[in-house]
């Protein structure tokens, strides 16, 4: 299988940089997979789990929004937050979800809609983390 270069960058660190076979990305308009030779485009990310496939092994990384650019040079993702499953503190993640739920009653209109959407994404990530497929 042909490979391509992939960079995953967050404000804190370079979370990944290297040659990969495939990257499955949680896009705002729907999830998408990237292989070598993919057509160029730019997409926004939603909070979700990014899957990086290299040599038959998969690495799961949680991203909490950002921007993806596919070009002839490869795939670059600028993520708001990028945390590997190994680094994730699931208790802190659950606490974050509880805090988001508690603050919903303080929001109205579009702000409430965005908060509910973000909470739904976080709950989906939590549900995926609790399945045996990710362990």
UniProtKB/Swiss-Prot annotation:
A Pfam family assignment? ATP-synt_DE_N
Name any GO cellular component annotation.
proton-transporting ATP synthase complex
Q: What is this protein called?
A: ATP synthase epsilon chain
Q: Which InterPro entries match?
A: ATP_synth_F1_dsu/esu, ATP_synth_F1_dsu/esu_N, ATPsynth_dsu/esu_N
* Source taxonomy: Bacteria, Pseudomonadati, Pseudomonadota, Alphaproteobacteria, Hyphomicrobiales
Give its localization.
Cell inner membrane
Q: What NCBIfam families does the record point to?
A: ATP_synt_epsi (TIGR01216), PRK13448.1 (NF009982), PRK13449.1 (NF009983)
The protein's assembly and partners? F-type ATPases have 2 components, CF(1) - the catalytic core - and CF(0) - the membrane proton channel. CF(1) has five subunits: alpha(3), beta(3), gamma(1), delta(1), epsilon(1). CF(0) has three main subunits: a, b and c.
Give the Gene Ontology MF terms in alphabetical order: ATP binding; proton-transporting ATP synthase activity, rotational mechanism
Does the keyword field hold rRNA-binding? Answer: no
- Please name the gene that encodes this protein: atpC
Signal peptide positions are none
Entry similarity comment: Belongs to the ATPase epsilon chain family.
The species this protein belongs to is Bradyrhizobium sp. (strain ORS 278)
List the PANTHER family hit by this protein, alphabetically.
Answer: ATP SYNTHASE DELTA/EPSILON CHAIN, ATP SYNTHASE EPSILON CHAIN, CHLOROPLASTIC
Its chief place of residence is membrane
């Amino acid at each position: 299988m042909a490979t391509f270069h992939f960079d995953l960058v967050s404000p804190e660190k370079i979370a990944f940089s290297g040659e990969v076979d495939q990257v499955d990305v949680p896009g705002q308009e729907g999830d998408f997979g990237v292989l070598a030779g993919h057509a160029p485009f730019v997409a926004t990310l939603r909070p979700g789990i990014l899957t990086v496939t290299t040599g038959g092994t998969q690495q799961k990384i949680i991203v909490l929004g950002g921007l993806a650019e596919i070009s002839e040079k490869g795939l670059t993702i600028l993520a708001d937050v990028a945390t590997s499953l190994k680094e994730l503190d699931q208790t802190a993640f659950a606490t974050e979800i509880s805090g988001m739920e508690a603050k919903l009653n303080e929001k109205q209109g579009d702000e409430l809609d965005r908060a509910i959407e973000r909470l739904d994404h976080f709950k989906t990530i939590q549900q995926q983390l609790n399945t045996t497929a990710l362990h």
